[in-house]
Amino acid sequence: TITRGTLPPCAECAKAKAKQKNVRKIGISPKAEKPGERVYLDVSKVTVRQKNGGEYNLPNKWWCIIVDEATGKKYALFTRTKRGITEPVCEWMHRMNSRGIKIRRVRMDPGGENISLKKRTESVDWQALQPVDFEYTSRDTPQHNHLAEVAFPYLAALGRAMLDTAYVPEKERGRLIVYAIQLAVQLDGLRIVEMNGVVATRDEHMYGEKPKWTKNMKRFGECGVVKEGKNGKA
């Protein structure tokens, strides 16, 4: 005869059905309404592959992205090492303070380089940056740092598109990709967005005016003539 019994839990079945816990779509903390109230920060490694499957040896291969939550304004810093972002980020925060934009909160993952950044901002050398609150995201939850996470593929794609449009030779792509990404970051500041009912560029929301270099914009990859001599100008 067959009788009904009790079966122990199947560990293999539980592992097969396991998935990451859903992350709430609406955050608990209110969104920043002013420039500098909260910025998102993350670090990634830049890799540029060659046609033969190898990779270019980039001198500054570590890319630190900073995104202002209120305006969406992006900033890119490139360093030789992952922990090398500490000083450049402090210098960036100092430059923002000098322009009247105080950085209040920094959201980032609890990586070693980010913990070093927090300690550096609390040092005597950068005491003027205080007070700054650091918000650490949970492990394996890139959704909590989404503005920085999404900015990486977005800006990298723009950089590759610029190189392709300019027909940059294969041997020069590794040298120019960082420069192209930096230009893409600057051009993203000209994107028109709405903030508190005001429609303007990200730069205008951030600084109150458009950058002066917009009057002298040239197409990426355009040939130019450099005159040398006493009165030579590029």
Segments predicted by a language model, with ranges:
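Retroviral integrase
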Residues: I2-L155, M206-A234
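Solvent-exposed, charged/polar functional surfaces in cytosolic regulatory/catalytic domains
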Residues: R95, L158, L187
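Short, intrinsically disordered/low-complexity patches at protein termini
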Residues: R99-G100, G159, R173
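Secondary-structure boundary/capping residues
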Residues: I101-K102, D164, G197
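Two-component system phosphotransfer/interaction surface
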Residues: F152, A156, Q182-V185
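A polyampholytic, Gly/Pro-enriched intrinsically disordered region
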Residues: P153-A166
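Charged, gly/pro-enriched flexible loop segments at helix/strand junctions
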Residues: Y167-K230
